[in-house]
Amino acid sequence: GGKFFLIQIASLLLYQSNNLIIAHVSGNTDVAVYNIAYKYAGIFQMIFSLIIAPIWVAARDAYIHDDISWIRGIMKKLNIIWIFFVLGSLLQLMLSQFAYDLWIGKSLNVSFYITALCFVYFILNMKAGIYNNIINGTGKVKLQFIMYFIQVVIHIPFAILLGKIWGIEGVLVS
């Protein structure tokens, strides 16, 4: 329970630190640009998260009953579903400027590059979500706990450094 709590705190630090860092290195307007691209790119992840959410409990049951073949099978199916989400995300990325024009008009300029970086983040995050749900289901969260801790320790200084060099894009690359 305590490790799950600390993982959630680390997630919060990872996800929310970008807003503060972008505001510091690039300005509040870029925070708005980042948030628009982030929200737009995150649409498919929201849907994907709904699909994989029940896997946590199912993986727990399979693990308790030593049904490793079920776990392997569901991972294979989820990876195939993930490919379709990647393709959908790429289509959504190609339509991003049109969507921004409808959504926010010409009030802000959200570059294709910033949007693409957000999509890369969410595509990788969806992939990691498959494995995180399986790991959580087995109750073996030590590796996930260590990885989140390392991510926080590395991400924040690199986001500040790269943000000072490349602006919002540097924060996203970090």
Label every model-predicted segment.
Residues 48, 75-107, 112-125, 156-160, ...:
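Alpha-helical transmembrane segments of multi-pass membrane transport and lipid-handling proteins
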Residues 1-57, 121, 125-129:
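Transmembrane helical elements of multi-pass membrane transporters/channels
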Residues 30, 96, 139-142, 152-174:
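Membrane-interface helix-loop junctions in multi-pass transport and translocation proteins
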Residues 12, 39-42, 77, 89, ...:
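Residue-level recognition of pore/gate-forming positions within transmembrane alpha-helices
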Residues 120-150:
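Membrane-interface junctions at transmembrane-helix termini in multi-pass inner-membrane proteins
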Residues 1-4, 8, 69-85, 110-116, ...:
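Membrane-water interface at loop-to-transmembrane-helix junctions
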Residues 45-66, 72, 132-137:
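Helix-loop junctions and terminal segments of transmembrane helices
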